[in-house]
């Protein structure tokens, strides 16, 4: 028995209601957060690291002005949305512990590649926005003392 394209579409649409959309692999905003800000095992953490990572993560078209990479496990970062974080401002959470981070700052000039970056290594509290218990946004404006 051959199913028509319309029947296949109907079966697919019905199956969407059965599979929970909150799974991490289906959470587009969480995946985007990881792509932009997660690097568990960095190497170098200097300007070459920034230029390489920004290019690899496709954050250079145009050159992104500032981006921070968090160097820890996904579980520890996710825990900020729960027991390892507390409310901060209106829609954010601040970590209860410090995280190793590298902040890459565009040196200026043309917003088009090749992009050149400075690197700033730090160990600080971080502020993120969470959605349904998943990190979805990193607050670049917060830098702890």
UniProtKB/Swiss-Prot annotation:
One of its GO terms (biological process) is cell differentiation. The modification Pyrrolidone carboxylic acid is found at residue 25. The keyword Disulfide bond applies. It comes from the Eukaryota. The active site is at 37 (proton acceptor), 137 (proton donor). Zn(2+) binds at residues 65, 106. GO terms for cellular component: cytoplasmic vesicle; extracellular region; nucleolus. It is found in: Cytoplasmic vesicle, Secretory vesicle lumen; Secreted; Nucleus, Nucleolus. The keyword Ligase does not apply. Keywords: Angiogenesis, Cytoplasmic vesicle, Developmental protein, Differentiation, Disulfide bond, DNA-binding, Endonuclease, Hydrolase, Metal-binding, Nuclease, Nucleus, Protein synthesis inhibitor, Pyrrolidone carboxylic acid, Secreted, Signal, Zinc. Transmembrane segments: none annotated. Has low ribonuclease activity (in vitro). This is Angiogenin-3. The lineage of its organism: Eukaryota, Metazoa, Chordata, Craniata, Vertebrata. The gene is Ang3.
């Amino acid at each position: 028995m051959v199913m028509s394209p319309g029947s296949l579409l109907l079966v697919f649409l019905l199956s969407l209601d059965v599979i929970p959309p909150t799974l991490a692999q289906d959470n587009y905003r969480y995946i985007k957060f990881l792509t932009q800000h997660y690097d568990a095992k960095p190497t170098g953490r200097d300007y070459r690291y920034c230029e390489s990572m920004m290019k690899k993560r496709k954050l250079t078209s145009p050159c992104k002005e500032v981006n921070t990479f968090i160097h820890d496990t996904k579980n520890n970062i996710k825990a900020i949305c729960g027991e390892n974080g507390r409310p901060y401002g209106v829609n954010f959470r601040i970590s209860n512990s410090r995280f190793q981070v590298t902040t890459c700052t565009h040196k200026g000039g043309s917003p088009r590649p090749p992009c050149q970056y400075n690197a700033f290594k730090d160990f600080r509290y971080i502020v993120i926005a969470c959605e349904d218990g998943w990190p979805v946004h990193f607050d670049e404006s917060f830098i702890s003392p």
